[in-house]
Structure formats: C-alpha cells, structure tokens
Amino acid sequence: MTTVIDGKNVAASVIQTVKSATAALEKSSGVTTGLAVVIVGDDPASHAYVGSKGRMAKECGFKSVQHTLPADTKQEDLAALVAALNADPSIHGILVQLPLPKPLDSEAIIQSILPEKDVDGLSVVNAGKLATGDLKTGLVSCTPAGAMVFVRRTHGEDLSGLNAVVIGRSNLFGKPMAQLLLNANATVTIAHSRTKNLAEVCRNADILVAAVGRPEMVRADWVKPGATVIDVGINRVAAPERGEGKTRLVGDVAFEEVSAVASTITPVPGGVGPMTIAMLMANTVIAAHRTAGQTPPQF
C-alpha cells in the first residue's frame, strides 16, 4: 500500500512546533520572534505570497512587519531598508520577496541580508555552511528543508546505506537538497539535463527527488519498487477535460503510475508546497533562539 504524504498535515505539525517554541522563548527570555517581509512593486502573485506569509507569522505569535515599496524604488533605498532591518534587534528574520522589478539587482540585496537573519537561506554564507555540514549556525533554504522533513519522517535521521538521486542542480533547490541528504549519510547522485541514461540512474534510488520543472517526466519504469518519491515540480498544463482553456497543476512525477510502484510519494499540489512557508516560520524561530542564546527547536 503506497503512502501519500499529506503536506498540509506535516506543515501543520511544523507550525505547531513553531508556535510552542515561540511562546516558550518569549516566556523564558522575553524575546518576541520578529519577521520582516519586504515587497517591491505590485505583482499580484507576490502580494498573495507575502499576505499568506504575514498571516502565518501572526498565527505563530511573531511580530510581523511588512514593508511595501513602489515599483520604481531605487537600489540604494532598498539597500538602506535592508541595512536598517539588519541593525534592528527586534527583527530575527528578513525576507525580500522575489522577483524584484527590473532594473533592481536582487542578488546584491539578498547577499546584503545578515546571514543569521537570512530566513530564505539564500545567502552564499548559508549555502557555504550547508556545504561544509554546519547545520548548527546556518539557515537552510525553505523548500529543501521542507522536503527533508518528509525524508526524515519516512526514513529517520540516519540515511546510511540508502541511495538518493536528486534530479535538478539549481542553487535554490537541487544543490542544497543533495547536501542535506549527504549530511544525513545517504549516498547521493545529482542528475540533470546533461545526465546520460537518466531513467537508469533514477532506478537505483531508494529516495528519488524530482525538481526540474518538466511535467510528469518521471515515469513508473524510472522508479525502484518501494522507493520514496519527493516531487518538487509544479507545472501548469492544459486540462481540456475541465473545459476550454482550463488548466491543472502537475508535478515532475507522473503521480498515478508512479504511486503504483513507490512505497511513499508526495502529491502535487498538497505535497512539498505547504512546507515552504512552514519552514520559513521554522527558520525564523530558529534564528530568534540563536540570537537569544537558546537551543533552537528541531524540525
């Protein structure tokens, strides 16, 4: 019987831990966890994301601050705001909603956030800490951190003897995901668009993670029977059966056929997606605990 991971349920349990840790920190050291979100311009999708992040932060008991700037904001003004938030001791996490409107240089802004407040886990310092196995002081990018929660809850903390294949080598997901699996003692292969015999490589995986943005690319005959399959892809495809011009969301994995082979699988939607905001909250409360000199919660 295949287990279909309910991402909403797992995310809710992460949020529960965040709430408890937030309340405990406030009680023990008087520190209220603070998250600042910066959004530039009026992209509706970005505003929807930021709104849901702000609501979740308040639900967790955080001090939640949103800075909304016009689309024609100058680079130096945005940089000055980030510098002010870096210097504000009541703010433990800073998130700049991407993409930024042109001609703003998002990379310069992201790298200017203090690594200890970089709750998106995008700074080169946090990437470097993950690469050297420093999970004690670094912050991990939210989507791979969320996918790793699924892996740990399925296989435990120690992945010794298990083969993991990550399809995708992006800095945002593929590389950090591979590092997390490696840190947990899995034997890791990173596959990508130039990999030969991709299906054959995937068939060796006890844990298969797909993150390339190609709809339903991973088929049943790519998957080792009994494998754990984590689908990070999110693709909108035509769904004429729903009516003219209608679409539906699918992952990088052909869910119906692969779920007949895998022992554990994440659906799209409702799998990895809900974990991203949950891990953003987790990173923020971890950052607050570190600032206060307290041991952060485990997720």
UniProtKB/Swiss-Prot annotation:
InterPro entries associated with the record: Aminoacid_DH-like_N_sf (IPR046346), NAD(P)-bd_dom_sf (IPR036291), THF_DH/CycHdrlase (IPR000672), THF_DH/CycHdrlase_cat_dom (IPR020630), THF_DH/CycHdrlase_CS (IPR020867), THF_DH/CycHdrlase_NAD-bd_dom (IPR020631)
UniProt cross-references to PROSITE patterns, sorted A to Z: THF_DHG_CYH_2
EC assignment: 1.5.1.5, 3.5.4.9
Pathway(s) per entry: One-carbon metabolism; tetrahydrofolate interconversion
Binding-site residues, NADP(+): G168, R169, S170, S193, I234
Source taxon at top rank: Bacteria
Keywords, in A-Z order: Amino-acid biosynthesis, Histidine biosynthesis, Hydrolase, Methionine biosynthesis, Multifunctional enzyme, NADP, One-carbon metabolism, Oxidoreductase, Purine biosynthesis
UniProt GO MF annotations: methenyltetrahydrofolate cyclohydrolase activity; methylenetetrahydrofolate dehydrogenase (NADP+) activity
Catalytic activity: (6R)-5,10-methylene-5,6,7,8-tetrahydrofolate + NADP(+) = (6R)-5,10-methenyltetrahydrofolate + NADPH; (6R)-5,10-methenyltetrahydrofolate + H2O = (6R)-10-formyltetrahydrofolate + H(+)
UniProt record, GO biological process: L-histidine biosynthetic process; methionine biosynthetic process; purine nucleotide biosynthetic process; tetrahydrofolate interconversion
GO cellular component, one term: cytosol
Pfam families the UniProt entry points to: THF_DHG_CYH, THF_DHG_CYH_C
Subunit structure: Homodimer.
NCBIfam families on file: PRK14186.1 (NF010783), PRK14188.1 (NF010785)
Family: Belongs to the tetrahydrofolate dehydrogenase/cyclohydrolase family.
HAMAP family, per the entry: THF_DHG_CYH
Function: Catalyzes the oxidation of 5,10-methylenetetrahydrofolate to 5,10-methenyltetrahydrofolate and then the hydrolysis of 5,10-methenyltetrahydrofolate to 10-formyltetrahydrofolate.
Protein name per the record: Bifunctional protein FolD
Gene name of the encoded protein: folD
